[in-house]
C-alpha cells in the first residue's frame, strides 16, 4: 500500500524522479551477475488482478492460492488488509516462483515485478482534489541492469513489460 507523502517532500524520496518523456537505462538478462538477486526477501504487495493471473497460471483455486502463497496483513490505520506474496522458507527468502532459469510465472508476474526498477505512486493535491502519477527509477544498489545501455521512456517500458493492462486493473 502507498504511503502518503507531502508534496514538498517528494524530492527527498530515494531514486530519480522520471517524467513521461524522460529516459532511463535498464536491461535485465541472465548474463548480468546479479540475475534473480532482486527476487528475494521482498515486501511484494499483490493486487486483485495479480492474484487472478497467478492463480490461473498455476491452475489453483483462489482459496488454494491464497493459502499457499499469500500473507494477509491488517495494519491498524488501514481499512483494507495488505495482501503480500509469501517468500519461500529458505535462507535467502526467495520468491516462491523463482527457479534456476528465472521466474516460472513470468508471463503472469505481478504488476510490481513488471514495473521494476520503476516505482510508482500518486501525487494527491488536496486543494484541487487531483491525483497525478509519479514514477521513480529505483534499482537496488547491487543491480547491474542499470548500467546496461538499453534506453527507455516510461510508456516504452510499460509496453515492453506488458504492464498497461495491469496498470488499468490496479490503479482504480
Per-region residue spans from a language model:
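Short loop/turn segments that flank or connect secondary-structure elements
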Residues: 1-172
